Amino acid sequence: MYRPIRALIDCTALQHNLSVVRSHTRQARIMAVVKADAYGHGLLRTTQALNTADGFAVLELEAAIQLREAGFNQPVLLLEGFFSAEELEAIDHYQLSTVIHSHEQLSLLLAHRKTGKPDIYLKINTGMNRLGFRPEEESYVFNRIRQWRSDTSITLMTHFSCADDALEADQVNQQLDQFAALHDVKENNLPQTLANSAAILRYPGTHADWVRPGIVLYGASPLPDKTGIELGLRPVMTLTSQIIAVQQLDPSDRVGYGGQFIANQPMRIGVVAAGYADGYPRHAPTGTPVLVNGQRTRLVGRISMDMLTVDLNGISEAGVGSPVTLWGEGLPVEEVAKSAQTISYELLTALSPRVPSISIS
C-alpha cells in the first residue's frame, strides 16, 4: 500500500507550452531552461518532451552530461559556467556550451588547452548585479578570449531583473540600453541572448538570437497579474492526493498543531496525505484553495509534516479515498503560491523526492 500523493506530469502540456513560446518568438531560437531537475518535473522526461527545442540550459555539469549520454545533440549550456579546470576538460569532451561570468573563470579558460571549438556565453552584468562582467569590461574579455582561440564562438548574454513587473519598464529599458551599447554588439554583431520567460511575453524587442524560457514551459506564469491559463499555457504538474480520514467537529473544536483553527459551527474536515515533507508549503494559511472531488474548498489549520486538513462542508459526498488536487489541473499553482506568500517556482522545484512522479499524456 502506497501513500496516495502523486505528481502527475503531462508531457503533451510541455509540448503545447513550447509551441506558445514559439508563437511569441518566431525568429529567435529557444534555449529551454531545464535546471533544478526541469523545475521539479524530471530532467530526461522533460527534455524528451521538449526535444524540438533548439538547446537546453542547465546548472550542473552532471545534468549536462546526462543529456549528452541520453543522446541529445543540441547545444547544452551551463548557466553558471565551470568551477575548476577538471570541469573544463569535461566541457571539452562532451562539447558543451558554457557561461563565463568572472575573471576567475576567464583565467581558468585561458590556461586551458582545448581541442574542440569553444562555445562561450559571455555574461554581462547590466543591472541584475548577480553574475557577469561590467559593461566596460566586455571588450577586454572578448579580446582576451579571441586571442586565446580565434575560432571561439561567443554569444553575449545578460539577465533582466524586473521583466516580470509592468511598473519596471524603465529598469528593463535601462538594462537593454546598456547591452545595446556594448562594443561588440555594435562592432562584431555577435549573437545575443537576453530574454527570460517574462521578457519573452512583455518585451518582444529583447528576443534577439536566443530566448531562455523557463517557468512558462511548465505552464506557470512569470507575470504577477496573470496565471498561466490566462496566458494560454497548460499546467504540466498536477499534485494530487486523497483523503485518508474524516473528522466531525463541534463548535469550538480546534484543529492541528497549535490549535490555530477553531470551528465556529458543526463541520466535517478531511485529512489529506500531503504535508511539508512532500513539498507542500508549510506556511500556507487557512483559506488556501484546494480541490476535493473537483470542488473548490479550503485548507484549515496548520500544515503538518505528512498531512494537511481541508474543509468538507458543502461537499457531502466527500470521504476517505476522495481525490484531492493541491495544485495543477483546475487549480493554478500561482493561486496556491500567492496564498502561501511565495512563488510558483518555489512550489514546483521544492517537490520532495519521496513523491512519486508519473508521466501522463
Curated annotation (Swiss-Prot):
Q: Name one GO biological process term.
A: D-alanine biosynthetic process
Question: What does the record give as the active site?
Answer: K35 (proton acceptor), Y257 (proton acceptor)
Q: Which organism is it from?
A: Nitrosomonas eutropha (strain DSM 101675 / C91 / Nm57)
Cofactor(s) demanded: pyridoxal 5'-phosphate
The protein's superkingdom reads Bacteria
Free-text function comment from the UniProt entry: Catalyzes the interconversion of L-alanine and D-alanine. May also act on other amino acids.
UniProt keyword annotation of Glycoprotein present: no
**Cellular component terms, GO, for this chain's entry?**
cytosol
Cite the EC number.
5.1.1.1
Report the sequence similarity comment from the record.
Belongs to the alanine racemase family.
- GO MF terms on file? alanine racemase activity; pyridoxal phosphate binding
Asked if Electron transport is a keyword of the record, the answer is no
**Cross-referenced InterPro entries:** Ala_racemase, Ala_racemase/Decarboxylase_C, Ala_racemase_C, Ala_racemase_N, Ala_racemase_pyridoxalP-BS, PLP-binding_barrel
Among PANTHER family, the record links this protein to: ALANINE RACEMASE, ALANINE RACEMASE, CATABOLIC-RELATED
Listed CDD domains: PLPDE_III_AR_proteobact
Pathway assigned to this chain's UniProt record: Amino-acid biosynthesis; D-alanine biosynthesis; D-alanine from L-alanine: step 1/1
What keywords sit in the KW lines? Isomerase, Pyridoxal phosphate
What is this protein identified as?
Alanine racemase
Instruction: Give the gene that encodes this protein.
Output: alr
Record's catalysed reaction(s): L-alanine = D-alanine
* SMART domains referenced in this protein's UniProt entry, alphabetically: Ala_racemase_C (SM01005)
Where does this protein hold substrate?
Answer: R130, M305
Residues found modified as N6-(pyridoxal phosphate)lysine = K35
